[in-house]
Structure formats: structure tokens, C-alpha cells
Regions:
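Glycine-rich flexible loops
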Residues: 1-273
């Protein structure tokens, strides 16, 4: 079967990077059954031939109007599809969609008519915000990192920036590679507009957001970047839990030590692009 990836090495590289990351998600135990979702903006790789490809699905509503997505193209994991299968066959377990001129609906154009993720409204709302603000970020990742989800079941970590402070204090790399910390979204029904709106508010100041008792959403320059930030935070959560399992609350780095890391390495306090 002919694929849109044929003779398009740059697009193919992006799709296969997505496949690589989904393999990592499965290996880490973050992607049970069909858990998790991915959406990546691939508009820059769409040539005139791609833009002329007829739809292979009916026009479907997004559920909201997103003015900055007009004519944009996204690779989306399919609803009900497993990350472990996507890792092997990305174009059979995900699809490329085109946003129509009304900015409120989409159609599938390649390779097969795979219905996008059930969290599509949230993912596209984030993509709309990134485009609106001129960000260079292209990818959104939703997954279920075990230790971070576990921490979200404890009220202490849902207050203010308490979870961020604890995670930053576990190892300098967390502060260095997740300098915006982790935002908190109180529990909301999965796939709901309320969840999308709350996530959008937190993503304005964080690259990774915790959905209470559910999972994380991360944005990044590409899907590997979004994965790396989530992975770094989850490592810190694992260190915290290992220390607790030895019978004590870990000391963590002091506020002064963390400030020294921030100052010496000139860590950003806002999204770099």
C-alpha cells in the first residue's frame, strides 16, 4: 500500500521518532492497553501534493473552534490503538489529519482512516495555543507515568507548587531539564472540555502538566523532547519513593542549593521558544 511517507524523508523521520517514543512508553509501563495519546504538528512537511490529497474520512467536528489551526496538519495516535503496536506500525495505528477552513472540524487524509485520539480536543487546543503564541513547540504527549500518578493521589502534592519543589529537590538534573516544573490540574472527566480548558491554563506556564489521578500532558519541540521532560520528572518521583521506602522523608536539595543550580546554569524561567 502506498504511504504518504514515501519519498518524504523529513516527514518519515518525524513519524519514526514518534514510533520510537511509543516503544519507550510501553517499555516503561506508562502505556497500558491503549493508554496515552500523541499529537504532532507536521504542517511544515506537507508539500503541494500532500495538500491535494483527498480526504479518506467524513468531516468530523473538533468540538471547539481553534482559529490558529486553519489548514494545519497533525499526526495523531488513533483512538483505541496501542502504543506498542504504533511503535511497529505508526501509519496503521495513527493518521494524519487536516484542519478545515472553519477551524472547527477535520478530516483524515493518510494513510488509512484511523479515528484520532479521544483526547483530540485537548491536544488541538494546546496546539492552537502554541501557534497563537509563536512557540516552536510541535508535540503534545499524554501518558500515565506510574510514580507521578501515584503522587497525585496524595493531597499534599496537589497544593500550589509542592510537587514541583519536591521533584526539583531530588536530583539537579530535574531542575536543569524540567525548569518549568509541573502544573497541577484537579481531577476532571477524561476527554471533557473542562479538562481541556484547565490544561490549557496550566500549559501557559509549564511544559508538563499533571492530571490528578490520571496522567501527564507534556509539550515539546518534538515528541522526544516532550517525553524527556516527563521522564526526568518521573525519575525524580521514583527517587523520592525509593527514599521513602527506606523509612524516612528524603532531605532533598535545599532552597539555596537549587537556586545555585538555577543561577550557575542560567536556567530558563519561561518557555525557551
Amino acid at each position: 500500500m502506498k504511504t504518504i511517507l514515501e519519498n518524504r524523508p523529513a516527514l518519515k523521520a518525524v513519524i519514526y521518532q514518534i514510533a520510537e517514543v511509543t516503544g519507550y512508553l510501553w517499555q516503561k509501563g506508562w502505556a497500558e492497553r491503549n493508554g496515552g495519546n500523541i499529537t504532532v504538528n507536521v504542517t511544515e512537511f506537507m508539500d503541494d501534493e500532500c495538500k491535494a490529497i483527498p480526504a479518506i474520512s467524513a468531516v468530523k467536528p473538533i468540538g471547539m473552534t481553534l482559529p490558529y489551526l486553519k489548514g494545519k496538519y497533525f499526526y495523531c495516535k488513533g483512538t483505541g490503538k496501542r502504543m506498542r503496536d504504533l511503535a511497529k506500525e505508526p501509519m496503521q495505528n495513527g493518521s494524519i489529519i487536516r484542519i478545515l477552513d472553519d477551524c472547527a472540524s477535520y478530516e483524515v487524509i493518510a494513510d488509512v482512516n484511523v479515528v484520532p485520539t479521544s483526547e483530540l480536543p485537548t491536544h488541538l487546543a494546546l496546539q492552537n495555543y502554541l501557534l497563537e503564541t509563536g512557540s516552536c513547540y510541535k508535540a503534545t504527549l499524554h501518558t500515565h507515568p506510574i510514580e507521578l500518578v501515584a503522587m497525585s493521589h496524595i493531597q499534599r502534592f496537589l497544593k500550589g507548587d509542592e510537587m514541583t519543589k519536591v521533584l526539583w529537590s531530588m536530583i539537579p538534573e530535574t531542575l536543569a531539564f524540567a525548569p518549568l516544573g509541573i502544573g497541577i490540574v484537579p481531577y476532571a472527566l477524561p476527554s471533557s472540555v473542562a479538562l481541556a480548558e484547565a490544561t490549557l491554563e496550566q500549559i501557559k506556564t509549564h511544559d508538563v502538566v499533571m492530571w490528578e489521578k490520571h496522567g501527564t500532558v507534556a509539550v515539546g519541540k518534538d515528541i522526544m523532547d516532550a517525553f524527556d521532560q516527563t521522564d526526568v520528572l518521573c525519575k525524580a518521583a521514583n527517587i523520592y519513593m525509593c527514599a521513602r521506602s527506606m523509612g524516612s522523608e528524603p532531605d532533598g536539595m535545599t532552597t539555596a542549593q537549587m537556586k545555585e543550580v538555577q543561577d550557575v546554569f542560567n536556567l530558563p524561567k519561561s518557555r525557551p521558544c
